[in-house]
From Swiss-Prot:
<keyword id="KW-0489">Methyltransferase</keyword>
<comment type="pathway">
    <text>Cofactor biosynthesis; adenosylcobalamin biosynthesis; cob(II)yrinate a,c-diamide from sirohydrochlorin (anaerobic route): step 6/10.</text>
</comment>
<dbReference type="GO" id="GO:0019251">
    <property type="term" value="P:anaerobic cobalamin biosynthetic process"/>
</dbReference>
<keyword id="KW-0169">Cobalamin biosynthesis</keyword>
<keyword id="KW-0949">S-adenosyl-L-methionine</keyword>
<keyword id="KW-0808">Transferase</keyword>
<dbReference type="GO" id="GO:0032259">
    <property type="term" value="P:methylation"/>
</dbReference>
<dbReference type="InterPro" id="IPR002748">
    <property type="entry name" value="CbiD"/>
</dbReference>
<dbReference type="GO" id="GO:0043780">
    <property type="term" value="F:cobalt-precorrin-5B C1-methyltransferase activity"/>
</dbReference>
<dbReference type="InterPro" id="IPR036074">
    <property type="entry name" value="CbiD_sf"/>
</dbReference>
<comment type="similarity">
    <text>Belongs to the CbiD family.</text>
</comment>
<dbReference type="Pfam" id="PF01888">
    <property type="entry name" value="CbiD"/>
</dbReference>
<protein>
    <recommendedName>
        <fullName>Cobalt-precorrin-5B C(1)-methyltransferase</fullName>
        <ecNumber>2.1.1.195</ecNumber>
    </recommendedName>
</protein>
Length: 366
């Protein structure tokens, strides 16, 4: 990509990892040169240059604390606008036996890993390997052989912000994660959100679950625990990204998946719609109308289905007609057929529910 100047750029954003690297660089530069920088130019692991503003910087003896405000560009998320504080302490006597002269630790508001299967060791702060590498790469240009630094990353209110993310489900407790492979948040790509979903699969496999339950979101999670007696780490929330998450599941060797969730989302899979966001495609009424027509040729019923406002309305129509189970069993079967033809090698089953968690239809490959 070359160079991005985030003093001017409003489309792209920068990751929490890039914030940490920029803050660490500015703090160390201040310690060594007694000069406050309003911005720094760092490089990511692809050797792109990122110019990132520094919000504030202070010095206390051999320690400097830099604050960088997270900017998400056009992909506004829960972390946009939060402060990340990076405290750097310089030691002129490097007697460390560690291979690196940069020690990176987590402070308040950075989560701690409590479940296996993630990129970071149990009990360690949730600072992913790529951000660590980016911090080290940029600081080494300022360090001599006999110098070492401790970099402490903190996020004020990080514990509260993290409650609105997937971190608690992933077993990352007490704060957010420091993430990012390139340091760049690309607009409207959903890349960062997709990447935050994928570790659920790693956690499930690390806990030796053979059958994973893929759900669209909270409704599916809640009722899978009740109806299927599923455990938290067995349930994988995919949001709208079925294509992405099923590709990840196949890459990671998952062999058995139960698709479970509300009819409004799951029905779309029967139509071959694997990004279920409404802006991509809908066709719920059309799909249900087609499968109802296999059971009844009552034109009035079919017209009502096409004109319905919600999937729940269609459920009521089919219930009154006495064909609810037959229609949704057929839809469930088609979901399994669609998924099996695209992701061969995985045994699929499907259960469709309503908002109350009542089963509407199911199909099991056996």
């Amino acid at each position: 990509m070359g160079k991005i100047d985030f003093r001017l750029e409003k489309t792209f954003g920068y990751t929490t990892g890039a914030c940490a690297a920029a803050g660490a660089y500015s703090a160390l530069y201040f310690l060594k040169n007694n000069e406050r920088l309003n911005f720094v130019e760092i490089v990511n692991l692809k050797e792109d240059s990122l110019i990132i503003p520094i919000k504030n910087i202070e010095k206390q003896g051999d320690t400097a604390i830099s604050t960088v405000e997270k900017f998400s560009g056009e992909d506004i998320d829960i972390t946009n606008g939060m402060d990340i504080e990076i405290e750097v302490t310089l030691n002129l006597d490097n007697n460390s036996s560690e291979s690196s002269n940069v020690d990176i630790i987590g402070g308040i508001g950075v989560g701690i890993i409590t479940k296996s299967g993630l990129q970071v060791t149990l009990g360690k702060p949730a600072i992913n390997p790529k951000p660590r590498e980016m911090i080290e790469t940029n600081l080494k240009s300022l360090l001599t052989d006999n110098e070492c630094v401790t970099v402490k990353i903190s996020v004020p209110n990080g514990d509260e912000i993290a409650k609105k993310t997937l971190n608690p489900k992933l077993g990352i407790i007490g704060g957010i994660s420091i993430l990012g492979t390139t340091g760049i948040v690309r607009p409207m790509s959903n890349d960062a959100y997709k990447e935050s979903l994928a570790p659920q699969i790693d956690v499930a496999l690390a806990n030796n679950f053979e059958n994973l339950i893929f759900v669209p979101g909270n409704i599916g999670t809640k009722h899978a625990k009740i109806l299927l007696h599923a455990e938290e780490d067995q349930i994988i929330e995919v949001s709208n990204f079925w294509d992405y998450m099923l590709n990840k599941a196949k890459e990671k060797g998952v062999k058995d998946i139960t698709v479970f969730g509300h009819a409004g989302k799951i029905v779309k899979l029967a139509g071959g719609i694997f990004d279920t966001h409404s802006k991509v495609a809908d066709a719920r009424n059309e799909i249900l109308c087609a499968y109802t027509s296999l059971v009844t040729q009552d034109v009035e019923i079919l017209q009502k289905i096409l004109q319905s406002n919600t999937t729940e309305d269609i459920v009521e129509i089919l219930t009154e007609k006495g064909i609810l189970k037959e229609v949704f069993d057929n839809v469930s079967k088609r979901v399994v057929e669609r998924l099996s033809s695209r992701w061969d090698g995985i045994n699929f089953s499907c259960i469709i529910i309503n908002m109350k968690g009542n089963m509407l239809g199911k199909y099991d490959q056996g």
